[in-house]
Amino acid sequence: MSSKPKSLEIIGAPFSKGQPRGGVEKGPAALRKAGLLEKLKETEYDVRDHGDLAFVDVPNDSSFQIVKNPRSVGKANEELAGVVAEVQKNGRVSVVLGGDHSLAVGSISGHARVHPDLCVIWVDAHTDINTPLTTSSGNLHGQPVSFLLKELKGKFPDVPGFSWVTPCISAKDIVYIGLRDVDPGEHYIIKTLGIKYFSMTEVDKLGIGKVMEETFSYLLGRKKRPIHLSFDVDGLDPAFTPATGTPVLGGLSYREGLYITEEIYKTGLLSGLDIMEVNPTLGKTAEEVKSTVNTAVALTLACFGTQREGNHKPGTDYLKPPK
């Protein structure tokens, strides 16, 4: 494991303006209510709670071309970037609870200010790499990667609210896992830029063990560096995470999701985490909401050392009779 002190800071990001459905701003509260913090405190990490950010709507936030709520999304991300950078400066792992996935702009930007050599593992049914020119919906939760990529700088007009963003990762610094709903413009971008991805076809063909081996070899083979895991719960199949805004059939299993997060923990390099797109208002039943929230909690815990094989406290002799 890494030698830096093991501590993490939870940042609630109750924000929904990157997409049209209300309720995703209730994600952080649902994860807290499910006992996420208490459970994290049982791991070897020192857990701090930053609380929830209070995002203020920008009045008269008219669309830019077809891009919706640009100033509100830009401002929320600018605020989040500052908080994440502060957490990183203090040597803690930033854990951002979304909120919609447009927040990755701020989360990854803030992380990169302190660790410019970071790499990104993006688990999602979607690439979220539409640009303001290729998007058909105008929803910014489908565009965060385009703002972060150096290779796309200058490929689309300046969006109001985003003047603070400096692209901070290259095409070779990101790997996608779980893709199965990619727009033509996005497919063109990932192919043209040579971005590494494991769609569900590759996951089916190789198995998740090989996928993670290849992911680490590609991102960390030459040099160990901080990992930012941006996890959209729709990366998993809707059988496990139905309460989310854009579910797509045929996704990762619960087991594959846990394997991804367990393996990332084992590298000792996880430095930033996003748990995104839990929308407790979209479950058809209480059971669907519970399943989605509990799955998101389990994925988060696995990132910090909770193992399916079980855990025990180091240095404790469990066979000693109690005094």
Curated annotation (Swiss-Prot):
It holds the Pfam family Arginase. Its cofactor is Mn(2+). Pathway: Nitrogen metabolism; urea cycle; L-ornithine and urea from L-arginine: step 1/1. Residues 1-27 are annotated as: Disordered. The modification Phosphoserine is found at S7, S62, S72, S163, S217. It is found in: Cytoplasm; Cytoplasmic granule. Its main location: cytoplasm. InterPro entries: Arginase, Ureohydrolase, Ureohydrolase_dom_sf, Ureohydrolase_Mn_BS. Expressed in macrophages. Expressed in precursor and mature group 2 innate lymphoid cells (ILC2s). Expressed in lung tumor-associated myeloid cells. Expressed in lung tumor-infiltrating dendritic cells. Gene3D superfamilies: Ureohydrolase domain (3.40.800.10). Mn(2+) 1 binds at H101, D124, D128, D232. GO terms for biological process: adaptive immune response; arginine metabolic process; defense response to protozoan; innate immune response; negative regulation of activated T cell proliferation; negative regulation of T-helper 2 cell cytokine production; negative regulation of type II interferon-mediated signaling pathway; positive regulation of neutrophil mediated killing of fungus. Binds 2 manganese ions per subunit. GO terms for molecular function: arginase activity; metal ion binding. The modification Phosphothreonine is found at T281. Substrate binds at H126, T127, D128, I129, N130, S137, G138, N139, D183, T246, E277. Induction: By T helper 2 (Th2) cytokines such as IL-4, IL-13 and IL-10. In tumor-infiltrating dendritic cells by prostaglandin E2. Key element of the urea cycle converting L-arginine to urea and L-ornithine, which is further metabolized into metabolites proline and polyamides that drive collagen synthesis and bioenergetic pathways critical for cell proliferation, respectively; the urea cycle takes place primarily in the liver and, to a lesser extent, in the kidneys. Functions in L-arginine homeostasis in nonhepatic tissues characterized by the competition between nitric oxide synthase (NOS) and arginase for the available intracellular substrate arginine. Arginine metabolism is a critical regulator of innate and adaptive immune responses. Involved in an antimicrobial effector pathway in polymorphonuclear granulocytes (PMN). Upon PMN cell death is liberated from the phagolysosome and depletes arginine in the microenvironment leading to suppressed T cell and natural killer (NK) cell proliferation and cytokine secretion. This is Arginase-1. The lineage of its organism: Eukaryota, Metazoa, Chordata, Craniata, Vertebrata.
